[in-house]
Protein backbone atom coordinates (compact mmCIF):
# COMPACT_ATOMS: atom_id res chain seq x y z
CA UNK A 1 0.00 0.00 0.00
CA UNK A 2 1.37 3.37 -0.94
CA UNK A 3 0.93 6.10 1.59
CA UNK A 4 -0.62 9.21 0.13
CA UNK A 5 -3.04 11.80 1.43
CA UNK A 6 -5.94 10.54 -0.65
CA UNK A 7 -5.64 6.96 0.63
CA UNK A 8 -5.43 8.21 4.24
CA UNK A 9 -8.54 10.34 3.69
CA UNK A 10 -10.42 7.35 2.25
CA UNK A 11 -9.28 5.17 5.14
CA UNK A 12 -10.41 7.74 7.70
CA UNK A 13 -13.75 8.23 5.96
CA UNK A 14 -14.48 4.54 6.68
CA UNK A 15 -12.90 4.45 10.15
CA UNK A 16 -14.63 7.64 11.32
CA UNK A 17 -18.04 5.99 11.13
CA UNK A 18 -19.47 4.95 14.50
CA UNK A 19 -21.95 2.07 14.48
CA UNK A 20 -24.70 3.23 16.85
CA UNK A 21 -25.94 -0.34 17.27
CA UNK A 22 -22.54 -1.61 18.46
CA UNK A 23 -21.20 1.16 20.66
CA UNK A 24 -19.51 -1.36 22.95
CA UNK A 25 -17.48 -2.73 20.01
CA UNK A 26 -16.70 0.79 18.83
CA UNK A 27 -15.40 1.59 22.30
CA UNK A 28 -13.17 -1.49 22.31
CA UNK A 29 -11.89 -0.61 18.84
CA UNK A 30 -10.46 2.78 19.91
CA UNK A 31 -6.97 1.52 20.90
CA UNK A 32 -6.48 -0.32 17.60
CA UNK A 33 -7.64 2.74 15.64
CA UNK A 34 -5.20 4.88 17.59
CA UNK A 35 -2.38 2.41 16.94
CA UNK A 36 -3.20 2.31 13.21
CA UNK A 37 -3.05 6.08 12.75
CA UNK A 38 -0.15 6.59 15.14
CA UNK A 39 1.85 4.06 13.12
CA UNK A 40 0.98 6.00 9.96
CA UNK A 41 2.03 9.22 11.66
CA UNK A 42 5.39 7.77 12.66
CA UNK A 43 6.01 6.35 9.20
CA UNK A 44 5.28 9.67 7.52
CA UNK A 45 7.30 11.56 10.14
CA UNK A 46 10.33 9.40 9.32
CA UNK A 47 9.75 9.79 5.57
CA UNK A 48 9.70 13.55 6.12
CA UNK A 49 13.00 13.39 8.01
CA UNK A 50 14.51 11.43 5.12
CA UNK A 51 13.14 14.00 2.65
CA UNK A 52 14.69 16.81 4.71
CA UNK A 53 18.10 15.16 4.43
CA UNK A 54 17.59 14.66 0.70
CA UNK A 55 16.70 18.35 0.38
CA UNK A 56 19.93 19.31 2.15
CA UNK A 57 21.91 17.05 -0.17
CA UNK A 58 20.17 18.45 -3.25
CA UNK A 59 20.73 22.01 -2.06
CA UNK A 60 24.43 21.33 -1.58
CA UNK A 61 24.66 19.58 -4.97
CA UNK A 62 22.87 22.43 -6.74
CA UNK A 63 24.96 25.04 -4.90
CA UNK A 64 28.13 23.32 -6.11
CA UNK A 65 26.68 23.14 -9.63
CA UNK A 66 25.65 26.80 -9.82
CA UNK A 67 28.92 28.03 -8.29
CA UNK A 68 31.00 26.08 -10.81
CA UNK A 69 32.53 23.80 -8.16
CA UNK A 70 30.81 20.56 -9.18
CA UNK A 71 32.57 17.62 -10.80
CA UNK A 72 33.54 18.62 -14.39
CA UNK A 73 31.74 15.54 -15.75
CA UNK A 74 28.44 17.03 -14.61
CA UNK A 75 28.96 20.08 -16.81
CA UNK A 76 29.62 17.86 -19.83
CA UNK A 77 26.19 16.25 -19.43
CA UNK A 78 24.43 19.40 -18.27
CA UNK A 79 26.37 22.58 -19.12
CA UNK A 80 25.96 25.72 -17.05
CA UNK A 81 27.88 28.64 -18.57
CA UNK A 82 27.87 30.85 -15.48
CA UNK A 83 29.59 30.74 -12.13
CA UNK A 84 27.35 32.32 -9.54
CA UNK A 85 29.28 34.07 -6.78
CA UNK A 86 26.74 36.55 -5.40
CA UNK A 87 24.69 35.24 -2.45
CA UNK A 88 21.39 36.82 -3.58
CA UNK A 89 21.78 35.53 -7.13
CA UNK A 90 22.64 32.07 -5.81
CA UNK A 91 19.50 32.12 -3.68
CA UNK A 92 17.39 33.05 -6.73
CA UNK A 93 18.85 30.15 -8.72
CA UNK A 94 18.30 27.71 -5.86
CA UNK A 95 14.69 28.82 -5.37
CA UNK A 96 14.01 28.47 -9.11
CA UNK A 97 15.79 25.11 -9.42
CA UNK A 98 13.39 22.27 -10.23
CA UNK A 99 15.21 19.61 -8.20
CA UNK A 100 15.34 21.83 -5.13
CA UNK A 101 11.71 22.94 -5.55
CA UNK A 102 10.53 19.34 -5.87
CA UNK A 103 12.27 18.41 -2.63
CA UNK A 104 10.55 21.34 -0.90
CA UNK A 105 7.17 20.29 -2.30
CA UNK A 106 7.72 16.75 -1.04
CA UNK A 107 8.34 18.03 2.49
CA UNK A 108 5.28 20.30 2.30
CA UNK A 109 3.19 17.29 1.23
CA UNK A 110 4.46 15.27 4.19
CA UNK A 111 3.64 18.21 6.48
CA UNK A 112 0.07 18.28 5.15
CA UNK A 113 -0.27 14.55 5.79
CA UNK A 114 1.10 14.92 9.32
CA UNK A 115 -1.33 17.72 10.19
CA UNK A 116 -4.22 15.64 8.85
CA UNK A 117 -3.21 12.58 10.88
CA UNK A 118 -2.70 14.71 14.00
CA UNK A 119 -6.31 15.87 13.67
CA UNK A 120 -7.45 12.25 13.22
CA UNK A 121 -5.58 11.22 16.37
CA UNK A 122 -7.30 14.02 18.33
CA UNK A 123 -10.69 12.79 17.15
CA UNK A 124 -9.80 9.22 18.11
CA UNK A 125 -8.71 10.38 21.56
CA UNK A 126 -12.10 12.06 22.01
CA UNK A 127 -14.04 9.09 20.68
CA UNK A 128 -14.59 7.67 24.17
CA UNK A 129 -16.48 10.83 25.12
CA UNK A 130 -18.49 10.73 21.89
CA UNK A 131 -19.53 7.13 22.56
CA UNK A 132 -20.35 7.91 26.21
CA UNK A 133 -22.51 10.85 25.13
CA UNK A 134 -24.29 8.68 22.56
CA UNK A 135 -25.05 6.05 25.22
CA UNK A 136 -26.33 8.70 27.64
CA UNK A 137 -28.52 10.19 24.91
CA UNK A 138 -29.95 6.76 24.08
CA UNK A 139 -30.69 6.16 27.77
CA UNK A 140 -32.35 9.57 28.00
CA UNK A 141 -34.53 8.83 24.95
CA UNK A 142 -35.48 5.47 26.44
CA UNK A 143 -36.61 7.21 29.62
CA UNK A 144 -33.74 5.83 31.69
CA UNK A 145 -31.79 9.00 32.16
Residue ranges: model-predicted function:
Residues 1-145:
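Charge-rich amphipathic alpha-helical interaction elements
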Amino acid sequence: MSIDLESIQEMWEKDAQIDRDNLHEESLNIPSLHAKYFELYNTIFLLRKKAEQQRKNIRHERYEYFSGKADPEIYIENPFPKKIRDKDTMQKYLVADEKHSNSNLKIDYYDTMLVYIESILKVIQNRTFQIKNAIEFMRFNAGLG
